[in-house]
Structures are given as C-alpha cells and as structure tokens.
Amino acid sequence: MLNSTGELEFSNEEDPEIISQLTSLPLSGGKSSAGVPEKTGYPDSVYVMAANIFQGIRIEKSAQKVLIKYGNEPLRSLSESEDQSFQRLSYELAFSALKYQDILETILIDSCIFPSTTIPDHLSSLIIVMLYDFQDRKFQTRVLSDNEEPISEVQEVENLLNSFKIKLAAALARCRIKHDALSIYHILPETVRKQELRASTLPLYAWINTCKISPEEVYNNLKRRGYNKVKSVLHIDDKVFAVDQHCYDVLIFPSHLKNDLINIDLFKDYKLIFQDKSRSLAVHSVKALLNMDDDVLMVNTGSWYTVSHMSILTNNNTSKVFVCGVQSQAKDPDLKTLFTKIGCKNIEILHEKFINIESKDHRLQKVKVILLLPRCSGLGVSNPVEFILNEHEDTEFLKDHSQGGISVDKLHVLAQQQYEQLTHAMKFTKAQAVVYCTCSVFPEENEAVVKKALEFQDLGNKGQPYRLSPPVLPLCSLKEIQLSTDKFFRMEPSEITNGCFLSILTRERDPSETVSVNDVLARAAAKGLLDGIELGKSSKREKKKKKSKTSLTKGATTDNGIQMKIAEFLNRETKASANLSETVTKPPLPQKNTAQVGASSQTRKPNKLAPHPAVPAFVKNTCPSRPRERQTHFLRPRPEDRMVALKPIKIVLPPVFMPFSSPQGIRSRMPTQHLYCRWVAPKALVPTCLPTHSLSRKEEKPKDDTPSSLLRPPRRWL
C-alpha cells in the first residue's frame, strides 16, 4: 500500500478558485479546442502494459542526476491482450510519457509526492505513465468501465494522484511559467514538435494483394462503400483514397479513416495490407531488377508484410524469396499460417544470421538480388509507434525519437553494422544487384556507408565489381529529380510520407560475356517461352549485311585497291574478248588445228559466242537483250597461273557437213556440246527440225512446235 501521509494536510492548503483556474489552463499539446472530445482515460490493462514498455525504454541518468528510482521487475497483468488496438494505445501512452520524462519527474518532485510518500520502485513507471494521462485529462476523474476487471496496482496509484491533484496542477503551472510555454508541448525540442505535427497529418498506405484481388476490383469495392478516388488525400476529411505515383499497387487513405478501414473485409481478408511506403519502394526496386527465374534474399526485413509483398510481386515467376535471420524456429508455424492467409507460396526461411551465411551457400546459387534493410536510427519516420507495430522494430526505436536525435557513439555503431552487412552482401558472386534501404536522415547511415563499401570492395572476387546505379523508380516531381542527381533515391520527411533513402548497386557488365539476340531467343525457346516457335538460321540477306558491315570498316586505301582491281579486270576481259573474236573470224584451219580447238573447248567454256561467217550479220540484231545480259554473267577472269598449256593431238573425226545440209548430218557432225553451240543459223534458212543449241535452250524457250527429242543435246562421242 502507498503511504500517503500529509494528503489531508495538503488538500486544505489551496483555495478552490485557484484549483479551478489551474485545471482550466491548457496542458499537453495545447489541444483544448471545443471540437476535441474530452478524454476519459484508459483501461487498467493499458496502463500496466504501457508501464512495462516505459520501463524498458526509459532514459537512464547518472547517479548525480537521478531523481526517481525505477525498479527492474515488470508489472504482472491479468491477461496479455493481443488486441492490436490495445497495443497501439499502450505504445502511444509509453512514448508520450517518454517524451515528457524529465518534466513529469520534475512535477512529482515539486509536488512532494517524492520523497514524502513511500512508493515501491517497481511502481515508478506506472506513476509516470498515469501522471501523463492524468494531466492530459486536465486532472479529471477517469471513467471506469463496468466490464473491466480492476488491477490493484493501478487503483492504488490512481488514488495517490487524485489526492495530490491540486499540488500536481500547481507544479505543472510553475513548470510552464519557468519555460515561458503555453503548455508542456512547447517545452519539447523543435524537432520532436515537428515530428508530432507531421504524424498528425501523415496518411495511411496500404498495398493491394494482387494474388487475391485486382486493383480494379478494389477500386469498385471502395466506391460501393462510399469512397471516392482522388489525386491527393491531403487535407480532405471525406471518405477518399488515391493511388500512389511510385507504386501502382499502393493506395493512400486519410489517417482519420483507419478505424473504419480495419473493419471492412478488404483488410480482414488480407486483400489490403497497411504498411509504410518506404518498404513498398524497396520491394518494387527489387522487382524491377529481377528476371523470370531469379531468386531474392531479404535481410533484416522486420515486418513479415514486407516479405509477403515481395512474394506477391514475384508470384507469376519461378523466383524464390529467401528470408534470413529468423532465429526462433517456434515462430515457423505462425509465419506459415500468416503466409497461407495472404497467399504466399515461394518463401523459404533461413534461421542463420546474414553475416554467418557463406556466399557460396548452395541454397542461394540462384539469388540475383539482395534486399538489405539494415537496422538504422529511423529518424525519418514521423509516427514511430505505427512503424514499430507494423515493422516489428525494437522498442529502443522510440528512445531516439523521444529526444529528436541520436548520440554520436550510437550513430557510429549503427553505421559500422550497416557497412559490414553491405560488404557481406557484395561478396555473393552469383548476385548481380544489392538494394540498400533505410529510414534514416543522417548521411553517415546512407551515402557514407554506400560509398565506403564501393571504395573498399573486394576486387579479388570472381564477379565483376559493383557500381552505383540510378533509381529504377519513377521520379514524380522536380524535387525528387534534384534529390536523385547523385544516383540516390531520397524522400524527405513531410506531411504526406516518411523519410526514405534508397540505393541500388549493380555489377558492371563483363565485356567478355556479350549476349546476342540469338542467344536470348535460344534461351527463351529452351524455357518454352516462345510457344513452340522455331528459330531459323540467319538468312542470306543477313549474312550479306554482316559482310557489308565488315567491308565498311576498311579504310579509303582499301576502296582504291578495289577500284584498281576492277579496272584491271575490265582491261583483261576486253583483251580476252578481242583475241577470241580474232581467232573465230580466221579461215578454217587444217584438221590438226581443228582438233586442237576441240580439245581446248572441252577444257573450258567459251567466254563469248562468236558469230560464224556463214551466219548473216542481222542475227546479232535479232537476238533479244536478255540473252546478252546472261552472257556477261559467264565472263569470269582466269588467272594466268592457272592457264593450262594445250598440246596438239590427233583425233579422227567423222566427215564434217556444212550447216545447210540435212539434220542427220548436222546431228552426226557435232562431237561435243561446245562445238555445237558455235553454229548459229538464221531462222529463215534453218529448217524447223534443226536442233537448238543448249545455251539458247537454257536462256529462252523455243516458241515453235519442235519435238522434244530434237531439242535434246547430242551425246558425246564414245
């Protein structure tokens, strides 16, 4: 029991008019407007839970500055309430008491509660949190619920505070006068006050579980419930929602609608899930770097909703999401139950710490992207209570926020831990990218860590070195573009979003591993992504294009050489044609020379058809232009080193008949096809049964009704 000696003595020392004046003064937060409903207090279980939270996060002082002693034993509660609303109320009450810890301790000393009364040390935390709520209610009596079971420790502390109500109000008034402040809210540091102001307007962010419902279905469902789609929810008191500009599956709601939203089926069935936007930015950055069958390794995820979001985004792929750092295997059944409710199927839990996992672990050989969410100061978060509840952060997170800053020593410790994790992530040779994300506003935890890791990265690994890559998220404003000029993605704390820092490290491309289009298509065909489409060989036109590209790389001297070769070729062909025409126009040679010509004709084809003296000259004019064009196609240069010297031989030939003899004589006269091709007769003088030479038959089909047997080329002489 509390010893409250002197309570009655003090109760008669003050005038009732002074009491009413003190209680009517604005107290914490300056929220004394008529529109704000009067607070009636919290249930007993909330006070006990808040006292235990405060006991773990309170600011410890040196022995010379200790005003109140705190015990180390937590208070026992009748039942651990798992209701999220009770947890939120307890954390908010503990965090508020932590921000005003110095002021509340001063009021307790000034009001003579300490050390005039004998109070057990383990109740000091409960007195602090209940005193904050007492002054926030303007020292009004708490309204008790009939269904609530009272807790003895709470009842004792409440009776003590009510008995010292007047003196507590006077001590609070003197404290405000000392600091020249309208309320104790204005005694807080400016950074903390700005943080509270941002938290009051910060909207709610929720991502759509596309595994269960499409965005269009969510829009229609909300519209049926009276929600209107707008571009911005800022300063709007109606039931509205907006779509985030950076993440297509994230919706934004005004903060005052949370109690209404958590009771609808979309949130109860895990079709919409509340989460801070910074986590969605990190997850979408990873998704933009993944291929169809790439795995992901997530480090220090905090909230399992972040893992679930990553799993939902890769649901259509063959990717796996590995999560490391889950040391307690007892949580596995609960996690699997949660993942089943959300619809996640590709999550694998690793119980080792990230630092203890080897880079050559056989389970992580397909991991291409590592998402690193290191523990940071988190001072970019405006509403730390919501962040702790949603992201499962340590309660130590609240201590730094209550003071609006962090000590230099603690900042260095955090930066060193972040550097070690980042450098360890860069040792995974199979990984191609690392996404580094924090909620800190200090460069020591952001740019400095990334630049140091890039500068001192181990270049002895088999993989290519890492480099800083630009953001893969869309930049939606000029301010975002200016903040991302150095390839870092930043979002400063504001009334619409928490602060966020995002960096993407990717490996430099190996110049020896150039992948062609055909390789990509072949890889896709092997995976069955082309629906059975067969890849054909490259066409002749593509080959000619490749040859033309290689020829274009030659210099001007090569072009001049080609022109000289063309000129030499034309001169040689002109001389060859002139010599051939001279030999054909000569008179008939003796039989010996004729045999020599026949032998040479068997060796090679004539380059050009020479007119026979017996054939009239008008035959040249009657020939169509197309055969002449084809004749030029057969003109090929013959190098001199390949010329074969012909020796005269004796060949006994049958009697030679003139071209105007009978067809039988013509047919028996020609020993070879080449000699046969030399005789050309005018159409008017040659009978219809005269066989056409093979060259003209190939070039142009006869128009007369000559029998097919006569059009056959004659056989060689046996």
Swiss-Prot record:
Residues 696-706 have a biased composition (Basic and acidic residues). May have S-adenosyl-L-methionine-dependent methyl-transferase activity. GO terms for biological process: RNA methylation; RNA processing. It comes from the Eukaryota. Residues 591-604 have a biased composition (Polar residues). This is Putative methyltransferase NSUN7. Residues 536-557, 578-616, 694-718 are annotated as: Disordered.
